[in-house]
Amino acid sequence: LDPDTFSELGAGVNTTGTRIDGRASDAPCDGAVVGTGKVDGRKVAVYASDFTVLGGSLGCQHGMKFIKLIEMAAAWGIPMVWLLDSSGGRLGYQDVPSAGIDWWFALESRYSGLIPQINVLMGPCIAGQAYCPTLCDFLLMSRETAHLWLGGPRMTQAATSETIGDNVGGADYHMEYSGTCDVVGQNDRDTIAKTRTLLSFLPSNCRTKPPYTEPTDDVYRDVSAIAQVVPDNYDQPYDMHAVIQLLVDDQNFFEIKPGYAAQLITGFARFNGEVVGLVASNPGVAGSATEIDACDKYYRFLQVLDAYNIPLVTLVDTP
């Protein structure tokens, strides 16, 4: 967030749950820090699970704080950002470990396409809360710390007797294989920086336009270098990213799902300061042939553009 813009909500809340063994427990903020702030001067709502408090697990007040926050975000028409680092449901307590999570899922779905919902994983996201990132518009993961799974390596080993590493469920796995992850940051700081960049391409809600940025490039600049990038021989592959860099403002292209179905490129850019969604064939990968993963990637991206009033620009070179 921009400096000195965070306003916390529900800071005085503590856990209302009781352990099964009857012992009392202390959970400041019930393991969730929520509130509003600004990113580049625009208001956003932020939810962060606190792993130092009962592993960031989901308790009743924890869930209620999020539910109230996303309802406020939808009413105000501002983006909702998650910072997740959670062990999932609060096991060992008398109240239902996943109390309120059905309401949580319902509100994520209800407000999908109305306000941008961005989930940022910078630690484990396990069990019931692992569904939440998949319901958001975008998921960003830290390569060093993020893991997304329902059970994890130990549960998988107990069920199948198969030993697997922590890389299963990590950022690279969900980028390359499942396609769940949209953007990978090298570490927490890099992931947060990319989240701010992503927000700069999105409107505050479905009723507004994306933010305009004054370009430093001349709109009539010479792009004849494209002729040296695109070969005359149709059978010769090339990297479409080079063409994109020549066309967009300030060579600034923010790619979505770069490691998934790489024969199709999707991402955000600006033309003369206006935000566009860009979809392009990439002849350098599999001859840019469109298959099922590429179709899923395209369709999901198109849904976001349609919801948030972002024009689509398509570069086609495919068999």
Protein language model regions, located:
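Terminal-region recognition feature
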Residues: 1-118, 124, 129-131, 135-151, ...
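A short, charged helix-loop
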Residues: 155-157
